[in-house]
Swiss-Prot record:
Species this protein is from: Acanthamoeba polyphaga mimivirus
Domain of life according to the entry: Viruses
Gene3D superfamilies in UniProt: Ankyrin repeat-containing domain
Name used for this protein in its record: Putative ankyrin repeat protein R747
ANK repeat extents: 70-99
SUPFAM superfamilies xref list: Ankyrin repeat
Length: 118
């Protein structure tokens, strides 16, 4: 069974703790690259349980500062997609907000700038 198919467990009607436990069980066999790709996919698809999935992936050992392809970190990607719940979750889990993507702008500055502009 594919990893993404295992995530399609029925989560409606479960408590937050039960959702986190079920998602964690589904992701147990995934490596960091697979976990990061799943996070990227749930951001792209605006999955309603994305915060639980991000928390489960980090609880399984994925660094909140994991670098995706093309030199984007998870936080960069969430900021680029303007995904506030994932941004907050990554920051709460310890993502480096002081890393500078460009010479004079931190992640937090870019996020604030995006919010103000839109």
């Amino acid at each position: 069974m594919r990893l993404m198919d295992r995530l399609m467990v029925k989560l409606d009607g479960l408590t937050k703790q039960q959702k986190l436990e079920n998602i964690t069980k589904a992701l147990l066999s995934a490596n960091n690259k697979e976990l990061a790709n799943i996070i990227r996919n749930v951001i792209d698809n605006n999955d309603k349980d994305k915060v639980f999935i991000v928390n489960a992936a980090i609880n399984l050992g994925l660094s909140p500062d994991y670098m995706l392809m093309n030199c984007y970190y998870l936080l960069d990607y969430a900021i680029m997609k303007n995904d506030i719940p994932v941004i907050v979750t990554l920051i709460e889990k310890g993502a480096n907000i002081n890393r500078r993507k460009y010479s004079d702008c931190s992640h937090l500055h870019l996020c604030a700038q995006d919010i103000i502009m839109y």
